[in-house]
Amino acid sequence: MDLNNRLTEDETLEQAYDIFLELAGDNLDPADILLFNLQFEERGGAELYDPAEDWSEHVDFDLNPDFFAEVVIGLADSDGEPINDVFARVLLCREKDHKLCHILWKE
């Protein structure tokens, strides 16, 4: 993989959020979608992390943090606080030529 051909952090967040919005209707409870839409402006967010270790239970490849990122999308108790009501965890490959995405949805 090419370190010079990676999505920036902002591009990674934007791509994960776009995928979340596109697929949320098929994967989240309607009440959760309504809550997210009503509360996102005040206390919603998307946070970028290195992939958590538990992804190894869901995917069968090396999650090198140089090329993979986890984006947590959800709601916090208040603006500026960490997300504690997680609606989706999105695993993305950051290499621009390698489109790969896995999502763990709120149950």
UniProtKB/Swiss-Prot annotation:
It holds the Pfam family DUF440. Signal peptide: none annotated. It comes from the Bacteria. InterPro entries: dsDNA_mimic_put, Put_dsDNA_mimic_sf. May act as a double-stranded DNA (dsDNA) mimic. Probably regulates the activity of a dsDNA-binding protein. HAMAP family: Put_dsDNA_mimic. Belongs to the putative dsDNA mimic protein family. This is Putative double-stranded DNA mimic protein Spro_2690. It comes from Serratia proteamaculans (strain 568).
